[in-house]
Amino acid sequence: MRAMHPLLKEILTHPPSGQHECVHGWVRSKRETKRAVFISLSDGSCPDTLQVTVPLPECSASLSSGAQAEQIPNVRDAVLQGETLAQTLKRVTTGACIRAEGALVPSPGAGQALELRACNLTVLGEAPAETYPLQKKSHSFEFLRAHAHLRARTSTFAACARVRSALAGAVHRFFSERHFQYVHTPIITASDCEGAGELFRVTTFDPVRIAREAHAAGAAGNPYALTYADDFFGKAARLTVSGQLQGEAYALALTRIYTFGPTFRAENSNTSRHLSEFWMVEPEIAFARITDCMDVAEEFLAYLLRAALKDCAQDIAFLDERAAQHARSARGDTPLAARSTARTPPVRTPGQLTRMLEDVARAPATRLTYTEAIKLLENSGRSFEFPVRWGCDLQSEHECFLTEEVFHGPVIVYDYPKEIKAFYMKLNADGTTVRSMDLLVPGLGEIMGGSEREEQFEVLCARIRASGFDPHDYRWYTDLRRFGTAPHAGFGLGFERLLQYVTGLGNIRDVIPFPRTPRTADF
């Protein structure tokens, strides 16, 4: 296979000084002097840019002609025949895509060790300054969300994309090293795992046609009825809210499995913490109890944070500084590392995000029951926005108070009341709590949640009925308890919540390439 063109990351990591190179990328900025033009070039492979220097006196005779354009497949008029140097450089604007050839030499300027002294410059794609939305000036996060198809070309979102890619790889490495099998669970399902009722329905029914036919039938005096039996699947189908139930089926055959895929919630909530489409990591372990679940979750989080600090140190350092500057000016985008349970957030200091991640990665989590957590909150003397009582679901303010002001580190709360947890969680002997757990971290609150699953057939069936579900819809799930049942446990990690934590970005819409939220499904 023909070798691909080198990335800037490869060139800058192992610089072949004095060697002739050909680079490709997008223009971040251009600066002109009497003797040279300086182009800041990025290809997104790393946080750094490469300075391309075009010496004006020497280059005019050697700039690209139409002959070079013919070497680039599917690029029409990449270089205009007979174009002068001035004309070519005029088309080199912020956002333009270019190819530059020349010698890599030590840079006499500050800020970079190397530069490319160009002898050949080709404009592959123009970005006219009068219409290209992302100019050299800084843009708000809100503005960039409206241009999500272009925002990866900014330094902040390119860094976030690289962190996302690195952490996705770390997820797979963690489980592969521990002999988990990766299982693909369905996106279209007939089962509701969480019971919240916030589901997207999947149908081939055409509402316009249905309305037209219903009107015609009504005008003729005939009732018009349509059921899911007439739909594509012959029954109600939905987008999945979790791959857990199907994951359990494979855990009870392969022992250790995990899923990693998109999930969907039709929750009509426009906040910095909610998405309608997001990714979940969900391991499931046969022959495991709730304590095993806690151990793996704690180890998993530390592994991911260490991987981010090791593999994305430069991006995290950049985000630590840059995201705070943007987020402070936008409501709802306060950097996570600067958040506090106090009414006035503390001043953000350089390196705060990195220090927080390092502290959480090495600190063992304090473990306490839900009942113990409620007592601590009730006796704290703190006036919370959401009042605390036994039986309430812990809110972010409660979780951050425990992690930041009581224990000063990660916390695992377990044994929650059964009324606020899902039907599949195993009942404790007291009959009022279930073997569930949440892993909480400073600056965010809950980052993972899991439980030991109910493995007894009769108890599970009773829990399904008590939760208001039709047992017939879960017949396949209860079969797992009828045939070769085994104790098992698992947990879920919202991948975007992890990314929020690692990048320090205050709005979850900024850690996924194309956010899906109520009334927003662009791109």
UniProtKB/Swiss-Prot annotation:
The broad enzyme category this protein falls into is: ligase
Q: What molecular function does GO assign, one term?
A: ATP binding
Q: Which GO terms describe its biological process?
A: asparaginyl-tRNA aminoacylation
Task: Write the record's keywords in alphabetical order, separated by commas.
Answer: Aminoacyl-tRNA synthetase, ATP-binding, Cytoplasm, Ligase, Nucleotide-binding, Protein biosynthesis
Chief site of localization: cytoplasm
Looking up Pfam families in the UniProt record yields: tRNA-synt_2, tRNA_anti-codon
Which compartments does it reside in?
Cytoplasm
Cellular component terms per the entry's GO annotation:
cytoplasm
Origin: domain of life? Bacteria
Q: What is its EC number?
A: 6.1.1.22
What are the start and end residues of every segment in region (Disordered)?
329-350
CDD domains found in the cross-reference section: AsxRS_core (cd00776), EcAsnRS_like_N (cd04318)
InterPro entries, alphabetized: Aa-tRNA-synt_II (IPR004364), aa-tRNA-synth_II (IPR006195), aa-tRNA-synth_II/BPL/LPL (IPR045864), Asn-tRNA-ligase (IPR004522), Asp/Asn-tRNA-synth_IIb (IPR002312), NA-bd_OB-fold (IPR012340), NA-bd_OB_tRNA (IPR004365)
Reaction catalyzed: tRNA(Asn) + L-asparagine + ATP = L-asparaginyl-tRNA(Asn) + AMP + diphosphate + H(+)
Q: How does it assemble?
A: Homodimer.
Please give the family membership noted in the entry: Belongs to the class-II aminoacyl-tRNA synthetase family.
> What is the protein's given name?
Asparagine--tRNA ligase
What is the species listed in this Swiss-Prot or TrEMBL entry? Treponema pallidum (strain Nichols)
